[in-house]
Amino acid sequence: MSSRVFVRSLAAAAKAGVKPPIQLFGLEGTYASALFTAASKTTSIESAGKALASLSKTIAKDAKLGAILANPALPAGDRTVVVQTLAQKTPGMDAAVQNLMQVLAENNRLNLLQGVAGEFTKLTDAHNGLVQATVTTAQPLEGKLFRRVEKALAQSSFIGAGKTLKLENVVKPEIQGGLIVEVADRTVDLSIASRISKLNQVLKESI
């Protein structure tokens, strides 16, 4: 299956009433969207998601494999062997995902595989009514505080009725304190670093 044929399945599926729940951008988003529609017609979205997650974990644990996938000079024959090996080592490999890997190999884009997996997760979360959110803090949020933030966000207009919040805590010491909340394309920056930056800007403008 060529890249054009695989991606065209997205348009064909849309005409049949099957389309991704949200719009994604970039190459990873395009491939993830095409996979979503292909899986919904041929295998299952859940099956494709599990196979991608398994592949992503395998790559993350194997630095050598990651380097091979990222090598743009890898010969076409070797790329095919890599795809076949990954398919054999992945329990319950999904046919639609294997087709995707073949397309990525043909176009020398196997380095996009983990990115596609991440974008596909966004689609499945949206399909299942999950809203992804990230709260960035200088130190890890303790259980009780994390649940308080989670509850406050879940009840906010950011999430919406009938949706379920999927919250992740990202630690970045450089924000110095406070927190940064990101939900979809919306960001609320309450970090100390941001406040200092704004103060410095005001001081510069007043001099």
Swiss-Prot record:
Keyword Transit peptide on entry: yes
Alphabetical list of InterPro entries matching this protein: ATP_synth_OSCP/delta_N_sf, ATPase_OSCP/dsu
MF (Gene Ontology): proton-transporting ATP synthase activity, rotational mechanism
Principal location class: mitochondrion
Keyword Transcription: no
One cellular component term from this protein's GO annotations in UniProt: proton-transporting ATP synthase complex
GO biological process: proton motive force-driven mitochondrial ATP synthesis
Keywords from the named record: ATP synthesis, Hydrogen ion transport, Ion transport, Membrane, Mitochondrion, Mitochondrion inner membrane, Transit peptide, Transport
UniProt subcellular location: Mitochondrion; Mitochondrion inner membrane
Cross-referenced HAMAP family: ATP_synth_delta_bact
Similarity section: Belongs to the ATPase delta chain family.
Protein name: ATP synthase subunit 5, mitochondrial
Gene: ATP5
